[in-house]
A protein has these predicted regions:
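Acidic, metal/ion-coordinating pockets
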Residues: 1-177
């Protein structure tokens, strides 16, 4: 939980992190992840140390959920041999564009790759695909920001992502797109 009152609970993520360290949370998977070729996770939240950031309005009043943790929480992923994080989900911009940029910086500081598509404007700050090659086979990983997905919108992100999949396949940049 990213809300301040949840940080004080003895069994909160925050308290357990302080007590047990970054390696605790995925310790039962770390050996498995270390042996695989590529571990990919969905990072469902914002990593930022900027306490001046406020949750963005999701149009749900007080019924929405906003997730945030300090940037050091990226160590949870690197400690477990996670290599790549999808950042495109409905919580990516819970704390606005700055929160998103802070999340990217935190993930990159731990040596992790990331991917996600946020808009069709080809802004390198908000769009990235991840390419991985093993034994001569290249895959491209893509994900799409949930809030903006409307498959019926011919100018929306869904149409744009379908176009990108087609272009990557036709250009030979990847053998498979996931």
């Amino acid at each position: 939980g990213g809300e301040d009152y949840l940080r004080t609970a003895e069994d909160s993520f925050f308290a357990v992190y302080e007590r047990e360290g970054a390696g605790y949370f995925l310790k039962n998977f770390a050996d498995f992840f270390a042996e695989d070729d590529l571990t990919v996770v969905n990072l469902e939240g914002v990593l930022t140390d900027n306490n001046a950031l406020y949750p963005r309005d999701k149009g749900k009043g007080d019924d929405g959920y906003w997730f945030r943790g300090p940037t050091e929480y990226a160590k949870v992923l690197s400690a477990a041999s996670v290599e790549v994080a999808s950042l495109a989900n409905n919580h990516a911009f819970d704390y606005g564009a700055q929160g998103f940029r802070d999340t990217i910086a935190a993930v990159e500081a731990e040596g992790l790759g990331w991917f996600g598509t946020y808009n069709k404007n080809r802004d390198p700050e908000t769009e990235k695909f991840y390419f991985y090659t093993k034994d001569g086979v290249t895959i491209c990983l893509m994900s799409l920001l949930w809030d903006d997905y409307n498959p019926q919108d011919p100018n929306g992100n869904g149409a744009y992502l379908r176009q990108q999949i087609s272009e990557i396949k036709q250009s030979g940049q990847a053998d498979a797109v996931i």
